[in-house]
UniProtKB/Swiss-Prot annotation:
PROSITE patterns: PUR_PYR_PR_TRANSFER (PS00103). This is Adenine phosphoribosyltransferase. HAMAP family: Aden_phosphoribosyltr (MF_00004). Keywords: Cytoplasm, Glycosyltransferase, Purine salvage, Transferase. It holds the Pfam family Pribosyltran. The keyword Cytoplasm applies. GO terms for biological process: adenine salvage; AMP salvage; purine ribonucleoside salvage. NCBIfam families: apt, PRK02304.1-3, PRK02304.1-5. The lineage of its organism: Bacteria, Bacillati, Actinomycetota, Actinomycetes, Bifidobacteriales. It comes from Bifidobacterium longum (strain DJO10A). The gene is apt. Belongs to the purine/pyrimidine phosphoribosyltransferase family. GO terms for molecular function: adenine binding; adenine phosphoribosyltransferase activity; AMP binding. Transmembrane segments: none annotated.
């Protein structure tokens, strides 16, 4: 598959020229991490000052809810950590790190979710989410939706409310958005799974 299989979704909010520039920086790596997979590497976007600026602008312009509707941004490990804090700082919000199990000091609360072959868990520090806190979840990619759903359950278990999701990329055909309980979401670009 070539770059032409990438569909510009909410990225169009920054204009055609900037959208095409950002897409041109997304690298397709066939056979990684295993044969039959095409890995979409957006690290070149982060390394390019213009690309990073476009990415952050696009994520903010494509927010699925108004900034007045959330108090914090929760970034999912690990690539949600790359742009989530910058978004939070620019919008005057706090940042919550949703980590893989065992990566945070005690006390934490966690949530498990199913993988194709087994289970995984995500955690937050117990004081990261206070009762009533409204949270926007951000990540680089929505595929099956398992991690985003687990993060939602975790934040809500802690007393918060997830108000929406912001993704850089969406893999179509895996029904990941179906696991988001109908909450508002946005993705900048879409591509086939």
């Amino acid at each position: 598959m070539a770059q032409s299989d990438i569909t510009i979704d909410a990225l169009s909010k920054v204009g055609q020229q900037d959208a095409e520039y950002l897409v041109s920086l997304v690298r397709s790596v066939p056979g990684f991490p295993k044969e039959g997979i095409i890995f979409r590497d957006f690290m070149p976007v982060l390394a390019d000052p213009k690309g990073l600026k476009i990415l952050l602008k696009a994520l903010e312009e494509a927010l699925p809810v108004s900034p007045s509707e959330f108090d914090s941004i929760a970034g999912l490990e690990s690539r949600g950590f790359l742009f989530g804090p910058a978004m939070a700082a620019h919008l005057g919000k706090g940042f919550i790190a949703v980590r893989k199990a065992g990566k945070l000091p005690p006390e934490t609360i966690g949530e498990s979710y199913d993988l194709e072959y087994g289970t995984a868990s995500v955690e937050i520090e117990t004081d990261a989410v206070q009762a009533g806190k409204r949270v926007l979840i951000v990540d680089d990619l929505i595929a099956t939706g398992g991690t985003a759903k687990a993060a939602t359950d975790l934040i809500e278990k802690a007393g918060g409310t997830v108000v929406g999701f912001s993704f850089v990329m969406r893999l179509d055909g895996l029904d990941g958005l179906d696991k988001l309980d109908g909450k508002p979401s946005s993705s900048l670009i879409a591509m086939p799974a």
